[in-house]
């Protein structure tokens, strides 16, 4: 039986997404393509590892979307830091990157990444997943 995501939305509580992406153009493209999903709100952004870690420690988000290469630091180190902070609430972790090697996938899984999408071709799959999340669907 697939695990159930602990995110259910209502008109009062949208699914809060935090996006870690260093390219303004890519960040804009992601938001432009996903922002119209009912029940989803982009509640935070960062383009560096240090800034993302600071914001993630200060706020609660339901979904975290990481790029691997960042302006400062990288998404894998950020995931490592988050996993070493057990007081943070559990969030759905997604890597959305053009670095799609199996090594990155394995390391991401070690730090709680549930989904890994290729930035160059899988934006529709990311959208479909987030649509499921906003409906409170069970995800495998």
In which residue ranges do the predicted regions lie?
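Active-site residues of response regulator receiver
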Residues: 67-68
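The feature encodes the CheY-like receiver
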Residues: 71
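Non-catalytic signal-transmission and effector/linker regions of two-component phosphorelay proteins
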Residues: 1-18, 24, 124-140
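Short amphipathic alpha-helix used as the core "switch/output" element in two-component signaling
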Residues: 76-89
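Two-component/phosphorelay signaling modules centered on CheY-like receiver
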Residues: 24-44
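Alpha4 helix (beta4-alpha4-beta5 surface) of REC/receiver domains from two-component response regulators
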Residues: 77, 99-117, 121
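Acidic catalytic/metal-coordinating carboxylates
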Residues: 48, 74-77
């Amino acid at each position: 039986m697939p695990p159930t995501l602990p995110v259910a939305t209502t008109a009062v509580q949208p699914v809060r997404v935090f996006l870690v992406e260093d390219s303004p153009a890519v960040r804009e493209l992601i938001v432009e393509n996903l922002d119209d999903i009912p029940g989803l709100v982009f509640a935070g952004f960062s383009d560096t590892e240090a800034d993302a870690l600071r914001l993630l420690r200060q706020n609660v988000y339901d979904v975290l979307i990481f790029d691997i290469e960042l302006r400062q630091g990288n998404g894998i180190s950020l995931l490592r830091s988050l996993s070493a902070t057990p007081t943070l609430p559990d969030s759905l972790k997604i890597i959305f990157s053009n670095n799609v090697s199996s090594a990155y996938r394995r390391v991401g899984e070690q730090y709680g990444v549930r989904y890994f999408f290729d930035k160059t071709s899988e934006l529709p799959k990311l959208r479909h997943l987030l649509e499921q999340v906003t409906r409170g669907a069970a995800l495998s």
